C-alpha cells in the first residue's frame, strides 16, 4: 500500500506540474511563469519544484518495488532463512543506531565548535561537512591530517584528542559491538532455522489465502463498491461499540481481587470466580504435567537406545572372542602321546591283562562304566568304538575280560590237565 501511495504521489505531482504550466501559459503566454514551466533549464528550477519531488519519489518507489521480490523468498528453505536473518540484523542495526547517533552527535558538536572560529580546513567548521567527515571516518575513508592546525597548538591538541577518542569509541568499540550483535542474531536464526523457515512460509501461504482485492494493480487504488460497503460497515460497528456495546458488555471472566481493589471478587460472583480460577490452574498444571511426561519419555527412550547400542557392541565383541577361541582350538587339535596310546588306554589294557591272568574264578561284579565323554575321547584316540557305536557287554555276559570268560577258560584248562596227580593239583591250588 505504501508503494502504491508513493507511485500515486509521483504521478500526481507530474499532473500538477502540467496543470500549472497550462494555466500560466493560458493566462500569460509571454510571462515568466510560463517560461519557467515550459522552457527553463534544470539549473534554473527552484528547490521545491514539483518535478524534483516527482523524480525523487519515483526513484525511491522503484527501489522499494524491486525489494518486494524478497517477499516470496520464504518459499525456499535456504533463501527464506537468509531473509529472516537479514531482517533480524536490520532490527539490531536500528536499535544500535540510537547509541551511535548519540555519540556521533556529541563528538560532532565538540569538533565543530573547536574549528568554527578558524576556518583552516574545508572539512571542519561546517556542520554538514563535519558530519560527513566523522561518518566516513568510521569506515576508514578520511585522512587524519584534516584536524591539523600547526599555528594553533591548543585547539589542535584538543581536536586531535577528540578525534582519537572518537576513533577508539566508534571504530573499535561500537562497530565491533554491532558485529557481535549481528553475529548473535544470525546464530540464533541458524540454531532454529527449520522452525523459523516453516513459520515464515506459513505466513506467506496465509497472505495468499486471505481475501484479495477486487481490482488488479494499479486499478485497486480506485474505490470500488465493496470498499465503500466495508467502510460503512466499519463505521457502523465503531459507532455501535462505542455507544451501546461498551456500556453493557460484561467481562468474559470475573474480576480477581488485587491489593488496589481487594473487594473485586466479593459478591454473588465469588463461586464463579473461584471455579474459573480452578479451571485455569487445572489447565496450567495439566499442561505442565504433560510437558514433563513428554520430556521424561523422550529422555528414557534415549537412555534405552544408548543401552541397547552398548549391549549390541558387547555381544558383538563376545562373539568375536568366542570365534577366535574356536579357531585356535581347531588349529591346535588333539595331541597324542609318543607311545601311541594315552595313559588311560594303557591303564585299561593293563587291567584287562590282569583279569585274564587270574587263576581262581571270581564272583561276577557289575561292570565299571566310563563316562560318555571320556569314553568317546579315549575310543577315538586308541581306535576303539565309542559309546554311540558298539556297546560294552552288560553284567552277566561273556566278554574277553569278564569274570565268566575267565571262569570258562580256567575250567577248560583243568579238564585238559585231568591226568595230573592229586598232590600236584593241591600244590597248584596252594600256589594259586
From Swiss-Prot:
Compartments reported by the entry: Membrane
InterPro entries from the UniProt entry: Ion_trans_dom, TRPC2_channel, TRPC_channel
An example molecular function term from Gene Ontology annotations: store-operated calcium channel activity
Topology of the protein relative to the lipid bilayer: Multi-pass membrane protein
Region of interest called Disordered, as start-end residue ranges on this chain: 356-432
Role summary: Thought to form a receptor-activated calcium permeant cation channel.
Recorded family membership: Belongs to the transient receptor (TC 1.A.4) family. STrpC subfamily. TRPC2 sub-subfamily.
Protein name as annotated: Short transient receptor potential channel 2 homolog
Protein's organism: Bos taurus
Gene name tied to this protein: TRPC2
Amino acid at each position: 500500500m505504501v508503494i502504491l501511495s508513493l507511485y500515486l504521489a509521483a504521478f500526481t505531482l507530474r499532473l500538477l506540474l502540467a496543470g500549472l504550466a497550462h494555466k500560466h501559459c493560458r493566462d500569460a503566454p509571454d510571462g515568466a511563469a510560463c517560461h519557467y514551466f515550459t522552457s527553463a533549464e534544470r539549473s534554473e528550477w527552484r528547490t521545491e519544484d514539483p518535478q524534483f519531488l516527482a523524480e525523487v519519489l519515483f526513484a525511491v518507489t522503484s527501489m522499494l518495488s524491486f525489494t518486494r521480490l524478497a517477499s516470496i523468498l520464504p518459499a525456499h528453505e535456504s533463501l527464506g532463512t537468509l531473509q529472516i536473518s537479514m531482517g533480524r540484523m536490520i532490527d539490531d542495526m536500528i536499535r544500535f543506531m540510537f547509541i551511535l547517533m548519540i555519540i556521533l552527535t556529541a563528538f560532532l558538536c565538540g569538533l565543530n565548535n573547536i574549528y568554527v572560529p578558524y576556518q583552516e580546513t574545508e572539512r571542519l567548521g561546517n556542520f554538514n561537512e563535519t558530519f560527513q567527515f566523522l561518518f566516513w571516518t568510521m569506515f576508514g575513508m578520511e585522512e587524519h591530517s584534516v584536524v591539523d592546525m600547526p599555528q594553533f597548538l591548543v585547539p589542535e591538541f584538543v581536536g586531535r584528542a577528540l578525534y582519537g577518542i572518537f576513533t577508539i569509541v566508534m571504530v573499535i568499540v561500537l562497530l565491533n559491538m554491532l558485529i557481535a550483535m549481528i553475529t548473535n542474531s544470525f546464530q540464533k536464526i541458524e540454531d532454529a532455522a527449520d522452525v523459523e523457515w516453516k513459520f515464515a512460509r506459513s505466513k506467506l501461504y496465509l497472505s495468499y489465502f486471505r481475501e484479495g482485492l477486487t481490482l488488479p494493480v494499479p486499478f485497486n487504488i480506485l474505490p470500488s463498491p465493496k470498499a465503500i460497503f466495508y467502510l460503512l460497515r466499519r463505521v457502523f460497528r465503531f459507532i455501535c461499540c462505542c455507544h451501546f456495546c461498551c456500556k453493557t458488555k460484561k467481562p468474559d471472566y470475573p474480576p480477581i481481587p488485587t491489593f488496589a481493589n481487594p473487594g473485586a471478587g466479593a459478591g454473588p460472583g465469588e463461586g464463579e470466580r473461584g471455579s474459573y480460577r480452578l479451571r485455569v490452574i487445572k489447565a496450567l498444571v495439566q499442561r505442565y504435567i504433560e510437558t514433563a511426561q513428554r520430556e521424561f519419555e523422550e529422555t528414557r527412550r534415549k537412555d534405552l537406545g544408548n543401552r541397547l547400542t552398548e549391549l549390541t557392541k558387547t555381544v558383538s565383541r563376545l562373539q568375536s572372542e568366542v570365534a577366535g577361541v574356536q579357531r585356535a582350538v581347531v588349529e591346535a587339535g588333539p595331541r597324542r602321546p609318543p607311545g601311541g596310546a594315552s595313559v588311560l588306554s594303557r591303564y585299561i589294557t593293563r587291567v584287562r591283562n590282569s583279569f585274564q591272568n587270574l587263576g581262581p574264578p571270581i564272583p561276577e561284579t557289575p561292570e565299571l562304566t566310563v563316562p560318555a565323554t571320556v569314553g568317546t575321547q579315549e575310543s577315538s584316540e586308541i581306535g576303539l568304538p565309542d559309546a554311540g557305536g558298539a556297546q560294552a557287554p552288560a553284567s552277566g555276559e561273556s566278554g574277553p575280560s569278564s569274570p565268566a570268560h575267565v571262569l570258562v577258560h580256567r575250567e577248560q584248562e583243568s579238564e585238559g590237565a585231568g591226568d595230573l596227580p592229586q598232590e600236584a593239583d593241591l600244590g597248584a591250588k596252594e600256589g594259586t
